[in-house]
Amino acid sequence: MGRIVVLYVDGAFGIGKTTVLRQIQKSAAYRFRRIYLEEPMRAWRSWFVDDHDAIREIYTTQELKDAGEIDLREASRRVCYAQVSLSAPFHIMNAVIYGIISGESEATSAHLGEGDYFVGVDRHPLASCLCFPVARFVTGYLEYTDLIALVATLPDYPRGASIAILDLSVEEQARRITERSRSGEHVNKTFLRILRNVFIIMYNTVAYLRNVSIDKACADREALEDFRGSQLESDMHKIDIQPRDDPNASETLFAVMASDATWRKNRKQSALFVYTMAKLDALLRSLNMHIVDINGLSQEQCAEKVVAISSKVPAVTARGNAPDLLFDAVEAYNADMGV
C-alpha cells in the first residue's frame, strides 16, 4: 500500500522555494507521484476584486511609515489587515489537505518510490500569521498588541507537520528579488536579514522545545526580559543568526514576544498572554522542522535535499481514493490561484 508525504517548503521570499518545488515536479529522477501546492498569488493580488492587492498594501504602508506620513498605529492597522488576507488561503487549504488525509494511519516515509505520493506545499500557514508578522514587529511596522492578536488567532493546525526551511544568504536573496522584478516587491536588506533570522529563530524555538518540558518552558518564559533593547533584538538587525540544536529560551520566538506590558501590578503575567504562549508552544513543539542550506546549490541539488528530507518525516498510508481526492483538490486550487 502506498504512502503520502506532505512537506511544507518555507523560508524568506525570493529564495527559490517555488523553483525547487517545480524542479521536483518536473524531474524524471523520481518514481513517486508528486504535486505541489502553489503560492496563492491570485488571492494575494486580486481575490474577487481587482483592487485588492495585499502585497502592495504592505509595501506601500511601510513606505508611508518610513516617510513619516502615517504613524505606527495606522501602519500596524494596515499591516495587520493585510496579514489576515495573506493568511486566509493557507488556512483554507491546510483544512482541505488534512480533511482528506486526517483519518489515515501513520507510516514510515523512507525511500519513497512507485506507488507513493509526495505533496509539496509552498509555505506553511505559520509563515503569514507568525513569521512575517514577527519580522514586521521587529522592524517597527506592527504594534505589539497586533502581533499578539495575530498569534492568538492561529487556528488549531494538525500536529506533526513537516517543514523544510530553505536558507540563503541575504546578498543572494536580494539579487534574486531584483532579478525577478515582481510587482510591489522592494529590496530592503535590513528587513530581509530580520525575516531570514525569524525563520531561523523559529527553527531554534522548535529545537529548544524539543529539549525542555512544558513546565520548564513556561518558567523560562516568565524569566525573559523585554525584547526591546535586548541582545536578541540587536543580533536580529546586525548578524545572520545560525541554527542551533541546543538554544536557550532567550534565543527563541518567545524572547521576541517578551514584553514588560504583559505584567500586571500584582506581579503576575496576563492570563491571556500566558495562554497564547502556551498555544504557540503546543503547536511548535509538535513540528518536524529541518533547515536546508541552499547557498551555492543548483536547482537539482536543492530538489535532492528537499526530497531527502521527505524520506525522514512522517507519512500516512494512502487508502482508497484519498490520493486522487488530494491531488484533484490541489490541481483545482492551483488553477484558481495562478496569475
From Swiss-Prot:
The active site is at E39 (proton acceptor). GO terms for molecular function: ATP binding; thymidine kinase activity. GO terms for biological process: DNA biosynthetic process; TMP biosynthetic process. Substrate binds at Y59, Q83, R182. Its EC number is 2.7.1.21. Disulfide bonds: none annotated. It is an enzyme of class 2 (transferase). It comes from the Viruses. Homodimer. HAMAP family: HSV_KITH (MF_04029). Catalyzes the transfer of the gamma-phospho group of ATP to thymidine to generate dTMP in the salvage pathway of pyrimidine synthesis. The dTMP serves as a substrate for DNA polymerase during viral DNA replication. Allows the virus to be reactivated and to grow in non-proliferative cells lacking a high concentration of phosphorylated nucleic acid precursors. Belongs to the herpesviridae thymidine kinase family. This is Thymidine kinase. It comes from Psittacid herpesvirus 1 (isolate Amazon parrot/-/97-0001/1997) (PsHV-1).
